[in-house]
Amino acid sequence: MQKAYNDIDQHLRQSGRESTVGLIIMGGWIEAMYLATQLAYDPLDPDAVVIQKIAEQKYTLTSLLSFLKNYYDDPVVVYYTKKLKYLKNYFDQYEIYFEKGDLEIDYGKQVLRSSGANMTITEDILEQIIGYIHKLRSEVTFP
């Protein structure tokens, strides 16, 4: 996967389309969130693990927004960054608390691992995130 990313990145840089890398990664994250919120999450029978995984995306979204700053010379990136910042407002409405000793940080792969977390996310906030992801995905895929 890393080789494919590097090959695409190199090709786009050589052709002067560096910002496309940012848009590809952003689109992949939006699609993954859409799948999680539309296929994995069942509002009639909510699964705590699925809710936790959706909620933990607040950290990934923060990283994505930071990554997209590299491509602010592209107005399309700026446009979607504003949309993602709006989405981040929903994620900022709750906290996630990890138990001491339960959180493992893999600096090499840049991931957090935890067997569980306490969070303050409400059903209303979750529904707002789900709705906005659906709207954003529709805009990206059917402009």
Region annotations inferred by a language model:
Residues M1-T81:
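Extended amphipathic alpha-helical interaction segments
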Residues F67, Y71-P143:
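A cross-kingdom marker for long, charged
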